[in-house]
Regions:
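Short beta-strand-centered aromatic/proline hotspots
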Residues: 4-6, 36-41, 146-150, 155-161
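N-terminal accessory targeting/assembly segments
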Residues: 1-103
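Short, surface-exposed secondary-structure edge patches
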Residues: 17-21, 52-57, 72, 120-127, ...
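P-loop NTPase nucleotide-binding/switch module
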Residues: 96-152, 156-158, 168-228, 242-245, ...
């Protein structure tokens, strides 16, 4: 047998002087340590391989072993509550074997092969099965039922089914025979290539919001289930904290959190916090619905790309079971930097700011895997992608931010000035937008209140008017404004501080139901209307400010508990009483 030997090594890029043995995007094992790699280029003379582990100690002349398979992930029960690296190696298992750092060539099974699962079979002999047909159900965690499915693209008639009971992931629990008479054994797991989207029947129109309990998002810039969002912001503006908050409280069934090139301490924080926090709907620990993929900044650069695709493949697998999945990618800029580094080592022609010319197509391949889908088994599920972008120096005109804007429909722009003024979330309402609002109007009208979107529009117009007036105030001071415009600035302050700003550490303010958000909006708009009537009668705005009513309305987010909205009546009476006393 002809050996395929390493010819050259340049960081994570390895060249082999042979082109017959390999195919494009094939997974290979490089060197005597069997480092995982992927074929990314084949020319007449050389095969180029991108290695997903550190190549320190690798020498020319060492063998490269082809596998004939693309890079794939193992899908089955046990994914949830786990923490993986970018190529689906379980970090907790590796830590038990070899400590805090991953040894090169470490090959640990992604899922526990010895654990027994309680399996309930849902098919019987003689049943016809096809791609994504559920043949077994397993309680994976207290919150999530795992549904084992036939591989897409396969079909046949069931010839053998095991009894309900306890099985490991590699036990055969069902056998079916296809139309050509070939028997296929089904265990509790399957493998799927990470760069191939899992097939669906069709995309469905987007119609439901991903409810996050964060007022600035749910009210002003909502994201839909199956939607895409970007969170761009400079250093220290709160991208990671925003994603942590969304991962904790959004109403997705499953969270996939991908830490791509960010600090390791942030992944540790997610692990520790999610074990302590309780899901408000089920009362179970949040970690029961979460899978973490940690590819921190000190891990091999090439694996950042794999971590993004691994995360979205796991998300699609749970979507096929009929779940709504949200994937947090923090941060896509680090992935783009990895593309730039490898592109430079391959001596490709750079495009804008040194990024490769194929950056937009790679970003689109990732974001287009989001969607609200009808699955092959006729269930409905969704994948929602929320990607953080880290533009250097908060420059939103750089290529990653600009190309991301082309593929996402919600844009939450984080503002350094707001962040340093301790305004959390630091989402700038002038730069941010959501294109899902027309799609979600019917849902808000039916499930919350027909007035919700109208009130939202009024709130947005108050903020827009304040922005215009602040230009005059900064030039000439607020004293030159007439009272009706001073009122706009005062009410806008109530909106900013009392509504948009949120306290992640307060028990009633960290997560706010939509009903409470609506009531808060209505109180602020009622205050605005009553004060307009008082000012229109010629009474000075100063007399209203001195009553302290604006500050009292700001504090209602803390004073009204989420489970007792009747206390909002007090604010209507107080506003009426104060306005009547001024009259």
């Amino acid at each position: 047998m002809k050996e395929n030997l390493i010819y050259s090594i340049n960081g994570p890029v390895v060249k082999v002087k042979d082109t017959d043995a390999f195919s494009m995007l094939e997974m290979v094992y490089v060197g005597n340590s069997k480092l995982m790699g992927e074929v990314i280029s084949i020319t007449k003379e050389f095969t180029t391989i991108q290695v997903y582990e550190t190549t320190t100690g690798l020498k020319p002349g060492e063998p490269v072993f082809p596998t004939g398979q693309p890079i794939s992930v193992t899908l089955g029960p046990g994914i949830l509550r786990n923490i993986y690296d970018g190529i689906e190696r379980p970090l907790e298992e590796i830590a038990k074997e070899s400590g805090a750092f991953i040894p090169t060539g470490s090959a640990v099974e992604p899922l526990d092969t010895k654990k027994l699962w309680d399996v309930t079979l849902t098919v019987k002999v003689g049943d016809h099965v096809e791609g994504a047909t559920v043949y077994a159900k397993i309680p994976e965690t207290d919150m999530i039922e795992h549904r084992c499915m036939v591989m897409p693209g396969m079909s046949g008639t069931v010839t053998e089914v095991k009894e309900n009971g306890q099985y490991t992931i590699n036990d055969v629990v069902m056998v079916f025979t296809d139309d050509e008479g070939v028997a296929h054994e089904c265990t509790l797991t399957q493998k799927w290539p990470i760069k191939t989207p899992r097939p669906v029947n069709k995309r469905l129109p987007i119609s439901m919001p991903l409810v996050t309990g964060q007022r600035v998002i749910d009210t002003l810039f909502p994201i839909a289930k199956g939607g895409t969002a970007a969170i761009p912001g400079g250093f220290g503006t709160g991208k990671t904290m925003t994603q942590h908050q969304l991962a904790k409280w959004c109403d997705a069934d499953i969270i996939v959190y991908v830490g791509c090139g960010e600090r390791g301490n942030e992944m540790t924080q997610v692990l520790e916090e999610f074990r302590e926090l309780v899901d408000p709907k089920s009362g179970k620990p949040l970690v029961d619905r979460t899978v973490l993929i940690a590819n921190t900044s000190n891990m091999p650069v090439a694996a950042r790309e794999a971590s993004i695709y691994t995360g979205v493949t796991l998300a699609e697998y749970y979507r096929d079971m009929g779940y709504h999945v949200a994937i947090m990618a923090d941060s896509t800029s680090r992935w783009a930097e990895a593309l730039r580094e490898i592109s430079g080592r391959l001596e490709e022609m750079p495009a804008e700011e040194g990024f490769p010319a194929y950056l937009p197509s790679r970003l689109s391949q990732f974001y287009e895997r989001a969607g609200y889908m009808e699955n092959l088994n006729n269930t409905n599920g969704s994948v929602t992608i929320i990607g953080a972008v880290s533009p250097q120096g908060s420059d939103f005109s750089e290529p990653v931010t600009q190309n991301t804007k082309r593929f996402v429909r919600t844009f939450w722009a984080l503002d350094k000035a707001l962040a340093y003024a301790r305004h959390y979330f630091a989402i700038n309402w002038n730069l941010s937008y959501s294109e899902y609002i027309p799609d979600l109007e019917r849902w808000y009208s039916k499930n919350v209140d027909p007035k919700f979107m109208r009130d939202r529009q009024e709130l947005a117009s108050i903020l827009a008017e304040e922005t215009k007036l602040m230009e005059i105030v900064q030039l000439m001071g607020s004293d030159v404004l007439p009272d009706d415009q001073k009122l706009v600035i005062e009410v806008a302050r109530v909106v900013r501080v009392g509504y948009l700003q949120q306290n992640a550490f307060h028990k009633d303010d960290t997560y706010v139901p939509l009903e409470k958000q609506l009531k808060m909006m209505e109180v602020i708009l009622y205050l605005n209307n009553r004060c307009q009537q008082v000012v229109a009668q010629g009474k000075p705005i100063r007399t209203i400010i001195e009553t302290g009513i604006f500050d009292e309305v700001v504090k209602m987010k803390y004073d009204v508990p989420n489970n007792d909205l009747s206390k909002f009546d007090y604010y209507y009476k107080k506003i009426d009483a104060i306005c009547a006393s001024i009259d």
